[in-house]
Amino acid sequence: MLPTLDARLTAAAQLVRPGQPVADIGCDHGKLTAVLAASGRYPKVIGADLRPGPLAKAKQTLENAGCLDRAELRLGDGLSVLSAGEVGSIVLAGVSAQTTWEIIEKAPWVSAVGGPRLVMVPATRHSELRRWLWQHGFALVADRPVQAAGRWYAVMAAEYTGEVTEPTFTQCLLGDTGRWPEGAGYA
């Protein structure tokens, strides 16, 4: 049985580039990994986590969804489980903004024009993640406020352009949420 995603993971899945391999870093329970693998829209789906326990849960989720044969699970720290050019999108959901940018900093190949799309759902400090992305040459190609379990999350997609920007406080706080109808209650 295919797992049900909450609103934030559903929004993240919608921002993954179709037709290209994808990695779900910090896959935890493997729900997003399973939904991506079952969709048939990606030639390769990789679920990775730092600890064996979550990977065992992810394996069980994939087995229950009937798509274990369409995903690959890897044990490792952040993006060290990937090689440059291996995926077109990387999902980083459920970790803090600081952890997100620390993961990105450890993989310089991500900061290259034409590199992978980063799909991020920071658990905390989304405004600081926006600032970090802009100050390090990334452009936000999507930025959506999503409510799940009674709280608001920022679901973002960024691609490296090399163009460094110094954003305002308001840009960091709200991003592009003014473009989305659900943005009214976001801040």
Describe each region flagged by the PLM.
Residues 29-42:
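Conserved SAM-binding loop of SAM-dependent methyltransferases across substrates and taxa
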Residues 2-7, 80, 86, 98-187:
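Class I S-adenosyl-L-methionine
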Residues 39-41, 63-69, 110-113:
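Short helix-capping segments at alpha-helix termini
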Residues 44-49:
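Conserved SAM-binding motif I beta-strand of class I
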Residues 1-20, 34, 52, 56-84:
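S-adenosyl-L-methionine
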Residues 86-94:
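Short SAM/SAH-binding signature in class I
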